Structures are given as structure tokens and as C-alpha cells.
Amino acid sequence: MYGVLQVVMRDTSLLDGLTKEDCVSISGVIEHRDEETYNPKIPTGTIELEAHSVEVLGRVYKQVPFEIMTSKETREDVRLKYRYLDLRNKKVKDNMIFRSQVISFLRQKMTEMGFLEIQTPILCASSPEGARDYIVPSRKFKGKFYALPQAPQQYKQLLMVAGFDKYFQIAPCFRDEDARADRSPGEFYQLDFEMSFATQEDVFKVGEEVLSATFEKFAPEGSVVTQAPYPIISYKQAMLEFGTDKPDLRNPLRIIDLT
């Protein structure tokens, strides 16, 4: 069984010699909890382990660099240096679990819509887009280099030529560019898809259906989710009215030409 289980130690001598964050193996007897101590938030919330013996599997010899449960209050550079400890913080761990659930749902949704998931190559020829390439030297061919893909653009178009009329993948993209507010520097993942003989409206429809279903499923309880169909505005209208190509339509302010 994997997960969280409450342990009760009636023999406090079992704690002798233990230090905080030691990794231990505990043997004992599974018992029912008292009803007033039930925890409905976890699958094991009605049982507990009465410890009979404790074996230290991995001892902590140095003080951990920060308190695990409050790691989000620690300086970011320290958290990143000890990322494996930071990920033990429940709030941080929940982010990883949430990401996994969203990706799993996206795969399910795209498959239901008739798309085929295909992984395209990571080591490829350079095809510059909007940023600099990450270059990987070839061991076999001296003086030659691979590039990490900024996007799987060429490969997915070749898949259309090959007769795979609906493709998708959760694609890793590598771009040597500065950090942005909505993605980390260097690499990010995107839902990438392509369809043969599709119109702009066909692409909008797929995107709208996937986004709508995803937000509907994962939006926090009680939050307001914008229902499809979503408003569509042209690039020209966005620039003239908002001064940006990705406006926040919740903002009621508009640019008005009075000349």
C-alpha cells in the first residue's frame, strides 16, 4: 500500500536515537481508529498502525536546510538547490500531482476526439523560430551539431504528408530565451496538435472544446468558469482596442481613437 498512514507509538522508547527526517521502517499491528479521530480526507483515515518496532533505513547526519512543511517561505535559490526536499512539501507536491492529472485528462480528451499521440524526435536539425537554438555536439560526426526542437513544427507537418491526419503530443520545447511570466526559461511543455485539411475554424473548435472541458474539470470549487463558445477577436482589433495581441478581456478598459 502507498500513501499516508497514521502511526501510534505507545512505547516511547522506540523514538530513542531518532532524529528529524530520518527514514524509518515501522512494523506493528493495524488497528481501527477511534471514530472521533477518523480522517475522511485520506483512504487510510479509519485505521492506524500501532508500532512495535522501528528500523532506521537512512539516518540524517546533518540538519536539513529548511523546514519541509514551510519550504515555500524559504529563499527560492535554496529551494531549487534542494528541490528533492522542497517537493516533499504538500503544497508543492500537490502542484506536481495536479499537473499530472491535467496532462492525463488532455491525453484522454484528445484521444476521444480522434487524435493519435506520436512523439517526434528530440535531437534534430536546426529550424530556427522565435528564439536561439540549444545546440548538442555530435560525438560521431566531429564539428556537427544537433539542435533541440523549439517546437515539433516540421515533424508534425511531415506526419500529415504521411497520412496521420490527426496528431497530438505533450511536446517538450527548448528555446534559449529569457524567462517569461507564463513559462520557465529554456524549456516548457505544450499541447501540440495538427490536422490535415483543417480550416482556422476547425482548429478553434478543437482548442475551445479541450480548454472548456479542462477548465470545467479542474477549476477550483465555487469558481466561475467561462462557458464556450469563447469570443473571437481579430489581431487588428486586439491591437487597436487593447494595445496587445493577448488582451485580458476581463479588463473593461479600451483604447479609443478620438482623432
Give the ranges of each region predicted by the language model.
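Class II aminoacyl-tRNA synthetase catalytic cores and aaRS-like
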Residues: 1-259
